[in-house]
């Protein structure tokens, strides 16, 4: 499999570096808000960490920040970072972060109203990182590097997340998103929502890969 870092461009390094700084900064500040909020509420720091790591936005942005860091560093990394530079992994992150932005804007922005610095972090995680990372994917993944089987990581990542959220909800009784809240809408509705989101992920991944593959013929 081709490695984007084998022939890095200045544009990839610059954009990846920008995304790494933006992503990690927003994630760290958001973690601080979550932990301190739950300490204030008497739930404790561990509960704050649990709530923080329950959001697909956070996990996907963490993956994107890791990929961006690996691309920014290029060959100056150890083997674990090499995995994050694989075209299939970059593509999985791109599909997920694109849908993070779209789903938040369409379904969640009217029920989420952060203020101050937390609002700035929200803008970074939901509105800046998604388009910038998709652009990074487009210029970082070499032409001809992707085949259709490379979409499996893009589908596996949200599928594993859905199982994680449902298992965590059974144990802790908390769900990060209303469309996954079994206690309010029941398992039947949650499964229908999961099926619908799965179809969206599959369609998005297929369209993105088709566009990327079509660019090789130009």
What are these regions (language model features)?
Residues 3-19, 215:
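N-terminal membrane topogenic signal
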Residues 21-38:
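Alpha-helical transmembrane segments of multi-pass membrane proteins
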Residues 130-146:
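Alpha-helical transmembrane segments in multipass membrane proteins, preferentially the mid-helix core
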Residues 34-39, 105-114:
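Juxtamembrane "helix-exit" motif on the non-cytosolic side of transmembrane helices
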Residues 56-59, 118-131, 191-195:
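Membrane-interface loop-to-helix entry segments
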Residues 11, 51-54, 172-207:
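Membrane-interface transmembrane-helix boundary segments in multi-pass integral membrane proteins
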Residues 78-96, 147-155:
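Interfacial segments of alpha-helical transmembrane regions
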């Amino acid at each position: 499999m081709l490695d984007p870092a084998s022939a890095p461009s200045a544009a990839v390094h610059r954009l990846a570096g920008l995304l790494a700084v933006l992503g990690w900064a927003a994630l760290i500040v958001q973690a601080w808000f979550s932990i301190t909020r739950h300490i204030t509420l008497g739930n404790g720091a561990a509960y704050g960490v649990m709530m923080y790591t329950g959001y697909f936005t956070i996990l996907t942005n963490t993956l994107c920040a890791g990929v961006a860091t690996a691309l920014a560093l290029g060959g100056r990394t150890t083997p674990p970072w090499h995995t994050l530079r694989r075209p299939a992994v970059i593509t999985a992150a791109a599909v997920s972060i694109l849908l993070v932005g779209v789903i938040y804007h369409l379904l969640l922005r009217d029920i989420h109203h952060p203020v101050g610095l937390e609002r700035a972090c929200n803008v970074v995680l939901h509105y800046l990182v998604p388009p910038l990372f998709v652009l990074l994917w487009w210029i970082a993944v070499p032409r001809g590097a992707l085949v259709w089987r490379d979409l499996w990581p893009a589908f596996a990542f949200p599928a594993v997340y859905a199982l994680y959220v449902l298992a965590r909800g059974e144990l802790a009784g908390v769900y990060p998103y209303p469309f996954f809240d079994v206690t309010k809408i029941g398992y039947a509705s949650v499964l229908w929502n999961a099926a619908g989101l799965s179809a969206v992920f599959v369609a998005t991944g297929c369209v993105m890969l088709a566009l990327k593959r079509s660019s090789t013929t130009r």
